[in-house]
Each structure stands twice: as structure tokens, then as C-alpha cells.
Design a protein with these regions (language model features):
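Catalytic cores of Mg2+-dependent Asp-rich isoprenoid enzymes
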Residues: 1-137, 142, 146-256
Length: 256
């Protein structure tokens, strides 16, 4: 976020704090009943923030940027609904429809909030933002398979598993199946498709106003490329960008 002006950067940090607070509920090892209670409390908290019940710094900061950038309450509630899908174990070999809905809620809604903060919120930029959000979320899924296994999650959609002859919903058996790497390759093509669609829409958008989003896109394109090079036969090798790769992408973001 170094290429954002200070106020916009601080707004993004406030959104990040909200997302982190939301994710921490789903990713904890607490009982499901406790997670559901906390999610209910978070939904109430968002309603109270919009009703100016601001009794702590988190609420005050978030409300300041909600008002400044006219952020729609629906997007925050959509993010919470996405986390609920994890808590309720819906995201184990989901249908294509559920998978797409999940990607919108946990990534697309964040992208639309970001566009409001960037000051570039129109039909074209929203289309770009949603394509990009899908691509980023799918890349995250393909990167975090090992970690998601430990949380009892398997995000690869059922239709892709079926296409590769994987009929079980048991995560350990899915990962052991010799066709699982092919299923991951199939999902990576869906990420590529969304990146390509984002690139097409970007041609008719203001690149100057979307610098941060473009930098994120370039970063994740490279990450996906490295994931495909490693493959999914073994999940032991962690895939990350080197400091040089990050620096190069940052320089590219400044001059684009």
C-alpha cells in the first residue's frame, strides 16, 4: 500500500483490521458454537457502528472511513457471511455456485470496498475488481491447501473433483488421490481466466487510480506462476515471492 496516499492507506488498514478480526473467528480452534456466537456479535457490531454506537477505537476508526468514503454496509455483512460459510463447513468440496458465492463474499466484497476508497467506483472498475478478486482468492486457495487441510477445509469445487474422477469428500483421501494435482491445475486455469478478464477490462479503466490493485494483480500472477511450476504433487515446498521479486513488482507499480 506504499503507492497509496496516506489517508487512503489508513482507510485500507482499517478495512484490513476488520477482515483480520473476521478471519480470526473462523480460523480459531474454538468450538463451533463459540464461533457462531462471535460472528453474531460481529454482525451486531457492524449494525451498531452504522448507528453511531462508537465505544472503542476500532469502531471509531472504521466509522470515520465508512463516512468518508461512503462504504456500503452490505459489503461488510457479505464478508461476515463468507466467514460463516467456513464456520458452517459449507466449504468442503462446494458446488460451483457455492464456490463462486464464497469468492465474492470473502474477496469480491473487499475489492468493492477498496474501489470506493481508491475513488474509482463505476461499472468498469467494479467488473475489474470482481474478476481480480476471484483470481486472488483462487490463487490463495491453491497456495494454502496444506494449511486448509489442518482446518478441515477443501475448497476445490466438486465439479472439478468429479471431472478428475475424485468422488470422495474425505479430505485426506482427496489429497492422496493421484489425480488431485490435475484437479488443482484445472482450478488454476479458472484463476488464469479471471486474470485475463481483469486485464481486458483494465484497458478501459484508469490505471493511475488502480495502481494498488494492479500491483496486487502482478504479485499474484507471479505467485500463481510459481505455484504451477512447483505443481501440487507435493505440498511441502512453500511457495512465496523473493524480496527481489517483490521489489521489482513495487518498482513496476510506481512507474506504471
Amino acid at each position: 500500500m506504499k503507492i497509496l496516499e496516506k489517508e487512503k492507506k489508513n482507510a485500507m488498514f482499517a478495512i484490513y483490521a476488520f477482515c483480520k478480526k473476521t478471519d480470526s473467528i473462523a480460523d480459531s480452534f474454538e468450538l463451533k458454537s463459540i464461533k457462531k456466537k462471535k460472528i453474531k456479535e460481529l454482525r451486531i457490531e457492524i449494525e451498531e457502528i452504522y448507528n453511531n454506537k462508537l465505544n472503542n477505537n476500532f469502531r471509531k476508526t472504521l466509522k470515520y472511513y465508512i463516512d468518508k468514503y461512503k462504504l456500503n454496509k452490505k459489503y461488510f455483512l457479505d464478508i461476515i457471511k463468507g466467514v460463516e460459510m467456513d464456520i458452517n463447513d459449507i466449504m468442503i468440496c462446494p458446488s460451483k455456485k457455492i464456490f463462486n458465492l464464497y469468492c465474492y463474499r470473502v474477496a469480491g466484497a473487499v475489492g468493492l470496498i477498496s474501489l470506493k476508497i481508491f475513488g474509482y467506483y463505476n461499472k468498469k472498475s467494479k467488473s475489474f475488481g470482481l474478476y481480480l478478486a476471484n483470481a486472488l482468492q483462487i490463487t490463495n486457495i491453491l497456495r494454502d491447501i496444506k494449511e486448509d487441510k489442518s482446518m478441515g477445509r477443501m475448497y476445490i469445487p466438486r465439479y472439478i473433483l468429479d471431472k478428475n474422477g475424485i468422488k470422495t469428500n474425505k479430505i485426506i483421501l482427496i489429497l492422496k488421490n493421484k489425480k488431485f494435482p490435475d484437479a488443482c491445475k484445472n482450478l488454476s486455469k479458472f484463476a488464469d481466466l479471471n486474470f485475463n478478464n481483469a486485464d481486458k477490462v483494465l484497458k478501459s479503466c484508469s490505471k493511475k487510480k488502480l495502481k494498488s490493485a494492479i500491483l496486487m494483480m502482478d504479485t499474484y500472477k507471479l505467485l500463481l506462476k510459481k505455484l504451477k511450476k512447483r505443481g501440487w504433487d507435493s505440498l511441502e515446498e512453500k511457495v512465496n515471492l523473493t524480496k527481489f521479486e517483490k521489489f521489482f513488482l513495487f518498482l513496476k507499480g510506481i512507474v506504471c
